[in-house]
From Swiss-Prot:
Pfam families linked: ATP-synt_F
GO molecular function: ATP binding; proton-transporting ATP synthase activity, rotational mechanism; proton-transporting ATPase activity, rotational mechanism
Identification of the protein by name: A-type ATP synthase subunit F
InterPro entries (alphabetical): ATPase_V1-cplx_f_g_su, ATPase_V1-cplx_fsu_bac/arc, ATPase_V1_fsu_sf
One GO CC term, this protein: plasma membrane
pH dependence: Optimum pH is 6.0 for ATP hydrolysis.
Temperature section of the record: Optimum temperature is 80 degrees Celsius.
Similarity comment: Belongs to the V-ATPase F subunit family.
Membrane topology: Peripheral membrane protein
Subunit-structure text: The A-type ATPase is composed of subunits A(3), B(3), C, D, E(1 or 2), F, H(2), I and K(x).
Length: 98
C-alpha cells in the first residue's frame, strides 16, 4: 500500500525528497479536488496526506472520500480550529474542555 500527498509546493517537494511518488502539487481548490479524487480512486493508495489549509477550503468535498485522510500543517504552521468534540461537550453541558 502507498501513501498519496496533496499539498502546496513546499509540502510536495518535501514528500518527493522523502521518496514518495504519488505527490500532487496544487495551486487551487479545483486542482486539489481533482488530485484527491484521483488518489481516492487508486486502489494502491492506503491513505492521503493533505495540508490543513487545503482540507479546510474543500472540507465539503472530503466527506465523500472513502480513504483515510491525514491533515498536516503547511509552511505557515498549524491552523487554530475548534475541536468538534470539545464544542459538542461545551454545548451539551456548558463546560469548556481544555
Amino acid at each position: 500500500m502507498k501513501v498519496g500527498v496533496v499539498g502546496d509546493r513546499e509540502t510536495a517537494i518535501g514528500f518527493r525528497l522523502a521518496g514518495l511518488t504519488d505527490v500532487y502539487e496544487v495551486k487551487n481548490d479545483e486542482e486539489a479536488v481533482k488530485a484527491i479524487n484521483e488518489l481516492a480512486n487508486n486502489e494502491n493508495i492506503a491513505f492521503i496526506i493533505i495540508t490543513e489549509r487545503i482540507a479546510e477550503s474543500i472540507k465539503d468535498k472530503l466527506k465523500n472520500i472513502n480513504k483515510v485522510i491525514v491533515e498536516i500543517p503547511d509552511k505557515h504552521g498549524k491552523l487554530e480550529r475548534i475541536d468538534p468534540v470539545k464544542e459538542l461537550i461545551r454545548k451539551a453541558i456548558g463546560v469548556s474542555m481544555k
